[in-house]
Amino acid sequence: MPTHLVWFRRDLRLQDNLALAAACRDASARVLALYISTPAQWQAHDMAPRQAAFISAQLNALQTALAEKGIPLLFHEVADFNASIETVKNVCRQHDVSHLFYNYQYEFNERQRDAAVEKTLPSVICEGFDDSVILAPGAVMTGNHEMYKVFTPFKNAWLKRLKEDIPPCVPAPKIRVSGALSTPLTPVSLNYPQQAFDAALFPVEENAVIAQLRQFCAQGADEYALRRDFPAVDGTSRLSASLATGGLSPRQCLHRLLAEQPQALDGGPGSVWLNELIWREFYRHLMTWYPALCKHQPFIRWTKRVAWQENPHYFQAWQKGETGYPIVDAAMRQLNATGWMHNRLRMITASFLVKDLLIDWRLGERYFMSQLIDGDLAANNGGWQWAASTGTDAAPYFRIFNPTTQGERFDRDGEFIRQWLPALRDIPGKAIHEPWRWAEKAGVVLDYPRPIVEHKQARIATLSAYEAARKGA
């Protein structure tokens, strides 16, 4: 009887899990599951404590779900990816594993680890799957067989390729012939700092996540284009955390969207949310093609020469939400308190750090990863490089958000700002976007800082720094 081992990583679900489905295809095989915790590696990768708590909860739910299918979950903890190579080898030897199944991860360290694992298992048949994307890296290329560097042509080619053959979702495995496990389960515990998260916003149980997806696609996807930019409105899917840890697959998102919004592939209702899924694909494909992106390197080489300011005071003010710009500060306090931030606010806060404070985007990238429950290297790096004008198809360097104008445009009446900045709750109407002006006129002393920089002057300094770097190219 063959023994099949499924190595779980960022794919913590039963439904539409390509590696798990392949491992369970042979009804006569004994199927085991493996998860390896690597705290030192996670620390090096700046994994957020809230994401660790989310993964821990998902693992325990996964262990229960697997047990009901008759599949035991083997849990091991080692320091880092290098140590995990030997762990996989030992598990395969101890359990006489004939086949190893896993879903690809596209980050540089993860790819090195997987290649090393396969080299240490010459007698084991290893099968990997492109599970975390809808179309595999390399499936969408230019006429010169190169990776697209601009999103819109990539999107058009991606949609054309998708329409030719939409990848199906695979069902959860059936219960094994041996039946469900009867032995009591030992709870999985991660030796990593953890912080509580809101399980109502970020459900753990697989069925609850699918219900969240169904509700959004049925009731929110068609109006997503109109509502997505306003942080006071519940207009986004909140599925990013489940996508980041693999509690949900992008194929599940695609199929549910098309079931509810069948015109999404042709620019109809739901197409704007589909665009966000394609951006996710774009950044993953880029990371596979350009591994330097995993090493904190800018895509546009001349931006390496930008003379960033080293100003710990400014950086800490940004981290704490004490910059004096209400929309920026409210957004950062939302991030610190919940581990999540609205996407429009991610753009605003990133732009402010880089182009108002002239602080290296990589510091912001790392801080976001250390806080985000939906931390994902490809998406986070892509977003930061877009905001910093260092990435492929990024905002041009001279595009600099005015933080006050952004607040007026996307939180006009200050509803979101008042939620997160209690010191400003009594400021009437639109005056909340420039509280220092209102305070001066009203003769009031606010428990809130004045702006740490003047935007117009900061804009001039940033343009000068970028232009100097570009001319040195």
From Swiss-Prot:
PANTHER family: CRYPTOCHROME, CRYPTOCHROME CIRCADIAN CLOCK 5 ISOFORM X1. This is Deoxyribodipyrimidine photo-lyase. The keyword Nucleus does not apply. (6R)-5,10-methylene-5,6,7,8-tetrahydrofolate binds at residues 109-110. Binds 1 FAD per subunit. The record marks 308, 361, 384 as: Electron transfer via tryptophanyl radical. NCBIfam families: PRK10674.1. The gene is phrB. Signal peptide: none annotated. PROSITE patterns: DNA_PHOTOLYASES_1_1 (PS00394), DNA_PHOTOLYASES_1_2 (PS00691), PHR_CRY_ALPHA_BETA (PS51645). Gene3D superfamilies: 1.25.40.80, DNA Cyclobutane Dipyrimidine Photolyase, subunit A, domain 3 (1.10.579.10), HUPs (3.40.50.620). GO terms for molecular function: deoxyribodipyrimidine photo-lyase activity; DNA binding; FAD binding. The keyword Transmembrane helix does not apply. It catalyses: cyclobutadipyrimidine (in DNA) = 2 pyrimidine residues (in DNA). Monomer. Involved in repair of UV radiation-induced DNA damage. Catalyzes the light-dependent monomerization (300-600 nm) of cyclobutyl pyrimidine dimers (in cis-syn configuration), which are formed between adjacent bases on the same DNA strand upon exposure to ultraviolet radiation.
